[in-house]
UniProtKB/Swiss-Prot annotation:
It comes from Agalychnis callidryas (Red-eyed tree frog). This is Dermaseptin-related peptide. Residues 23-43, 74-75 form a propeptide. Residues 1-22 form the signal peptide. The modification Glutamine amide is found at Q72. InterPro entries: Dermaseptin_dom, Frog_antimicrobial_propeptide, FSAP. GO terms for biological process: defense response to bacterium. It holds the Pfam family DD_K. Expressed by the skin glands.
């Protein structure tokens, strides 16, 4: 009976160790995924900012060109 109890305790202990290792690996994977998501969000924000700046510059250039044409037509 004592042998059976020791075996059962050993199996339970090994199961807990295995579960602990699996949970740790899962947490590490979740942390890596969060970092990747953060990096992707940062890249998107950077890209949107760049596109916004380009659109502003294009709008200013178009406005300047139209203003120049209007001024030439008035002369």
């Amino acid at each position: 009976m004592a042998f059976l109890n020791k075996s059962l305790l050993l199996v339970l202990f090994l199961g807990l160790v295995s579960l602990s290792i699996c949970e740790e690996e899962r947490r590490e994977n979740e942390d890596e995924e969060e970092q990747e998501d953060d990096e992707q969000s940062e890249m998107r924000r950077s890209l949107l900012s760049t596109l916004g700046n380009m659109a502003k510059a294009a709008g200013r250039a178009a406005l300047n060109a139209i203003t120049g044409l209007v001024n030439q037509g008035e002369q």
